């Protein structure tokens, strides 16, 4: 991050966890949105179950090298070394985060992007905790970011972790409004490839709400921050049956039914945080959530293999 507000943790590159007294109190808008989420899930459940049961795995036809991407960040002072490491790895698909609050200070980002010539870039435009308080400002910030970076890419992933209050959205309805304000920019920028939904972890109710609604936007692909580290390996289950493969299967089944997204699933974030790396990993030292380097490498390899063999992930 170029600029780091007081609510931003520069080590873990995310907003600080909200204290109880800082969490927004429930309002009628929250209750109404929760009701919409529940009703949408209830009405969609039969079709989702059918879609899930009919879905069959089919290994991806992509070159495995094209299937793998890497997320990079700016602001640590070793951008040239990072470019060298990216080239050494041979990875071609890169994701660069640009926070909305850096919209007036983009020179360092464009300089960095210039050094990544020839790479396929996706830019993740991060919302701030204040974005849902001023949607016009949010739109203006996104407009500036796209305008300055459109010479490097037309792929933009909008928002991050919409189901975490510390990122600014008190409920999914606010996230949909952020997406709508970006949709209005299509008349100014042609051939945009927009990713959205942006639900972190496995929360199918909110994923379905973000994919099936009457908001005014369209997505070229669904972005899922599908972390499974709390279940240990990718074969660990949640709710008894949902290991990584079944989580991908359910997410893909919902995308196939979506009236907001094309039938494309991108896993835009996943990882296993490392042991003994505080303050960069806030919960480091907890063996139920963090792993050593050898285990991380093994789990990431399994994750990629499962996702690739399913054929459900782009």
Label each region the model flagged.
Residues 116-177, 289:
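Substrate-binding cleft of extracellular glycoside hydrolase catalytic domains
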Residues 63-104, 115-116, 120-122, 148-154:
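Catalytic domains of carbohydrate-active enzymes, especially glycoside hydrolases
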Residues 72-88, 108-109, 134-148, 203-214, ...:
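Short, acidic/polar
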Residues 71-81, 95-108, 127-139, 164-168, ...:
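Acidic-and-aromatic substrate-binding clefts and catalytic sites of carbohydrate-active enzymes
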Residues 22-63:
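Alpha-helical membrane-targeting segments
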Residues 2-27, 44, 153-156, 264, ...:
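Substrate-binding cleft of secreted/luminal carbohydrate-active enzymes
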Residues 66-72, 92-96, 121-125, 154-158, ...:
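Hydrophobic faces of well-ordered beta-strands that scaffold small-molecule active sites
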Residues 172-312:
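Noncatalytic carbohydrate-binding groove/subsite architecture in carbohydrate-active enzymes
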């Amino acid at each position: 991050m170029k600029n780091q507000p007081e609510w931003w943790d520069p080590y873990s590159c995310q907003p600080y966890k909200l204290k109880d007294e800082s969490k927004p109190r429930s309002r009628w808008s929250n209750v109404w949105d929760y009701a919409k989420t529940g009703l949408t899930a209830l009405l969609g459940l039969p079709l989702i179950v059918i879609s899930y049961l009919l879905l069959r795995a089919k290994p991806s036809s992509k070159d495995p090298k094209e299937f793998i991407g890497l997320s990079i960040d700016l602001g640590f002072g070793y951008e040239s070394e990072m470019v060298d490491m990216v080239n050494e790895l041979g990875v071609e698909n890169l994701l660069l985060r640009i926070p909305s609050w850096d919209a007036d200070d983009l020179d360092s980002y464009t300089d960095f992007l210039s050094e990544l010539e020839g790479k396929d870039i996706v830019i993740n435009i991060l919302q701030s905790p204040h974005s849902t308080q001023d949607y016009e400002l949010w739109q203006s910030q996104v407009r500036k970011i796209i305008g300055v970076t459109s010479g490097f890419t037309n792929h933009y992933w909008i928002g991050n972790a919409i189901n975490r209050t510390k990122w600014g959205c008190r409920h999914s309805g606010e996230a949909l409004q952020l997406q709508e304000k970006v949709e209005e920019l299509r008349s100014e920028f042609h051939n945009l490839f927009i990713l959205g939904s942006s639900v972190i972890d496995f929360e199918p109710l909110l994923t379905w709400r973000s994919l099936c609604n009457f908001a005014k936007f369209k997505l070229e692909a669904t972005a899922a921050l599908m972390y499974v580290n709390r279940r240990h390996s990718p074969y660990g289950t949640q709710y008894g049956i949902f290991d990584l493969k079944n989580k991908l299967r359910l997410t893909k089944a919902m995308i196939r039914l979506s009236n907001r997204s094309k039938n494309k699933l991108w896993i835009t974030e996943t990882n296993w945080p490392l042991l003994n790396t505080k303050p960069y990993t806030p919960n480091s030292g907890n063996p139920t959530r963090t792993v050593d380097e050898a285990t991380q490498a093994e789990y990431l390899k399994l994750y990629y293999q499962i996702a690739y063999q399913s054929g459900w992930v782009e």
